[in-house]
Amino acid sequence: MMLILLLPLVNAESKQVDLSLESSVADYDVGISTGELSPDGKTVLLVGNEGYVHLISAKNAGDRSLDVELNSARDNDFNDVSWHPRSEAALIAGDFGTAMRYEKIDHSVTIVNGTGAILGRDMSSVEWRSAGDYAYFGGKDGSLWRFSEGTGFVNLGNDADSEITGISCHMNYDLCVVSTISSGLGVIGQAHNVSWISGTRTDTWVDVDCPDASLNECVAFGSGLRMISILLNTVDHTKSDVGSMVEYRTLDGDFISSSRGFSGTSIIHLAPSATVRYEPLNDVAKVQVSSEQMADWDSVISGRQISYVWENSFNSGFVITSNGNVISFEPYQIEIENTMLTTAILIAVSVSVPGVILGLIYMNSPFLQRKYNQIFKKRKR
């Protein structure tokens, strides 16, 4: 039985970041589904509708001269992407049995081995496990597959009966978690067998993430602003469980997906257009960009869905919208107006601080006190 915690506090006391429109990756609506930051932190691979694949700089995402236009030679929609842990290649999952490999060395995008096994199935999710020996694909029909270039695709069995919405693998263990529309949450063990967690089928799960390598847990995000921790049993994955359900009713909109944040955090995407940072180590959620801030900043872009977010440092990174807009964000800087009052305060502080320091030195120095008394007595004479 899951305990549901209603109305937990979400830290939204002040503005967290400043937003700036950098550019767009194209002069038309490219229909970006998602993206992923390479493990080396240098590039971001974007995928989208009608075989769209595009590589951009992670540090200078607004600079179109650094882009690499890729050709997939496919017109099927691409739904997910996952980099290999060594950053040399990435796998792409798409509709109608599409499974592609991007190679960094020559920027080629080619069909992987063994796609005949998934022909006709729409692949919705893909993720490499931490060892980099196998990747897992999930389908809109609920099927789950393991993949390696040597063996191709092998069905895991014990499939879900609804769409796989997300797969995320722990960074220290060869354990992966799975979210679904209506089949609950699952855990894939080291031997590729799937175990479904009881009591999780009643929610609509939109994504899952394992952001903190120091914790033996992941987190699932559900429709209705609901979130739950997945407690991994690293010895026997079938004994993995969930924590208490949390429902963030004070937020506007709804959870739709997530991205990996900086320093072991998750960035939750909300519709229509907002982000929330979740820190699993402290079990704290903080509004990063509110829907009100986004609307005040740009009323047109605020109506577009967030497809991917990444950070190069805490609260410093980029947002990609489904249309292809590139939005940078930086920590919010409070500007102090340079008035006569603030100038007077600064002068007073600059004068008083040295005096306080000298006073403390005098109070703690018997030698200086004796010298002062000697001088004072001489003057009195």
Spans of features found by a protein language model:
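Residue-level hotspots at or immediately adjacent to binding/recognition sites across diverse folds
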Residues: 12-381
